[in-house]
């Protein structure tokens, strides 16, 4: 009898831990993919910056610091403390919105030799993975709710024909914002993944 109870306990433990193991695997894949996208974003931005004169870099950086990224309309944690206090579902939903906001603009990214053609399909794959994680972490009553963030305004006339100076500024802003947002998503997914391991230290 004692042996049967022990065996039943082990089976129950394995079954109950299976969803956690699946989530950990999905999180590992998602984190790996966004890390790759973040590296691509850094490379694109670095390649573009290296093609500029020193004064051009200084002026563009000054302008960018006064501007906002299009994705700033997506409400996200303001600092690392708020990030750590946010729920897993909230971090996943914000990440989903950020990734989705780049599906169209990513087609217009440019900057040296970085393989930009890889970016759009990788964003789509990451978005699908995050959606699976959202579904896995939702309550049953919420399972059919829309995880998308509010509709993000378009990039205005970025895709229209622009003068040389304006085009340079817009390209700089687009690449800088893409790098910034991929860093955000990497941070949010890493923290959310860490939450699945109670013994882990999830401090940023």
Swiss-Prot record:
<dbReference type="GO" id="GO:0031667">
    <property type="term" value="P:response to nutrient levels"/>
</dbReference>
<dbReference type="GO" id="GO:0070186">
    <property type="term" value="F:growth hormone activity"/>
</dbReference>
<feature type="disulfide bond">
    <location>
        <begin position="194"/>
        <end position="202"/>
    </location>
</feature>
<feature type="binding site">
    <location>
        <position position="36"/>
    </location>
    <ligand>
        <name>Zn(2+)</name>
    </ligand>
</feature>
<keyword id="KW-0479">Metal-binding</keyword>
<feature type="disulfide bond">
    <location>
        <begin position="69"/>
        <end position="177"/>
    </location>
</feature>
<dbReference type="InterPro" id="IPR018116">
    <property type="entry name" value="Somatotropin_CS"/>
</dbReference>
<dbReference type="InterPro" id="IPR001400">
    <property type="entry name" value="Somatotropin/Prolactin"/>
</dbReference>
<comment type="similarity">
    <text>Belongs to the somatotropin/prolactin family.</text>
</comment>
<dbReference type="Pfam" id="PF00103">
    <property type="entry name" value="Hormone_1"/>
</dbReference>
<dbReference type="InterPro" id="IPR009079">
    <property type="entry name" value="4_helix_cytokine-like_core"/>
</dbReference>
<feature type="modified residue" description="Pyrrolidone carboxylic acid">
    <location>
        <position position="18"/>
    </location>
</feature>
<comment type="function">
    <text>Growth hormone plays an important role in growth control and is involved in the regulation of several anabolic processes. Implicated as an osmoregulatory substance important for seawater adaptation.</text>
</comment>
<feature type="signal peptide">
    <location>
        <begin position="1"/>
        <end position="17"/>
    </location>
</feature>
<dbReference type="InterPro" id="IPR034975">
    <property type="entry name" value="Somatotropin"/>
</dbReference>
<dbReference type="GO" id="GO:0005131">
    <property type="term" value="F:growth hormone receptor binding"/>
</dbReference>
<dbReference type="GO" id="GO:0046872">
    <property type="term" value="F:metal ion binding"/>
</dbReference>
<keyword id="KW-0964">Secreted</keyword>
<keyword id="KW-0873">Pyrrolidone carboxylic acid</keyword>
<dbReference type="GO" id="GO:0005615">
    <property type="term" value="C:extracellular space"/>
</dbReference>
<keyword id="KW-1015">Disulfide bond</keyword>
<dbReference type="GO" id="GO:0060396">
    <property type="term" value="P:growth hormone receptor signaling pathway"/>
</dbReference>
<protein>
    <recommendedName>
        <fullName>Somatotropin</fullName>
    </recommendedName>
</protein>
<feature type="binding site">
    <location>
        <position position="186"/>
    </location>
    <ligand>
        <name>Zn(2+)</name>
    </ligand>
</feature>
<dbReference type="GO" id="GO:0045927">
    <property type="term" value="P:positive regulation of growth"/>
</dbReference>
<dbReference type="GO" id="GO:0046427">
    <property type="term" value="P:positive regulation of receptor signaling pathway via JAK-STAT"/>
</dbReference>
<keyword id="KW-0862">Zinc</keyword>
<dbReference type="GO" id="GO:0048513">
    <property type="term" value="P:animal organ development"/>
</dbReference>
<keyword id="KW-0732">Signal</keyword>
<keyword id="KW-0372">Hormone</keyword>
């Amino acid at each position: 009898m004692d042996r049967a109870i022990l065996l039943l306990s082990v089976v129950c433990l394995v079954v109950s831990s299976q969803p956690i193991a699946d989530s950990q695997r999905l999180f590992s894949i998602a984190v790996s993919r966004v890390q790759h996208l973040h590296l691509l974003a850094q490379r694109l931005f670095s390649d573009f910056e290296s093609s500029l004169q020193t004064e051009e870099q200084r002026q563009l950086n000054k302008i960018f610091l006064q501007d906002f990224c299009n994705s700033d309309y997506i409400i996200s944690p303001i600092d690392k403390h708020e990030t750590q206090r946010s729920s897993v579902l909230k971090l996943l939903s914000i990440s989903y919105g950020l990734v989705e906001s780049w599906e169209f603009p990513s087609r217009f990214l440019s900057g040296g030799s970085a393989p930009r053609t890889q970016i759009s399909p990788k964003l789509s794959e990451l978005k699908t993975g995050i959606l699976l994680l959202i579904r896995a972490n939702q309550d049953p009553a919420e399972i059919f709710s829309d995880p998308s963030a509010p509709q993000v305004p378009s990039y205005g006339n970025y895709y229209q024909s622009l003068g040389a100076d304006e085009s340079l500024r817009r390209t700089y802003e687009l690449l800088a914002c893409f790098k910034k947002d991929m860093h955000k998503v990497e941070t949010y997914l890493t923290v959310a993944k860490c939450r699945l391991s109670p013994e882990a230290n999830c401090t940023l």
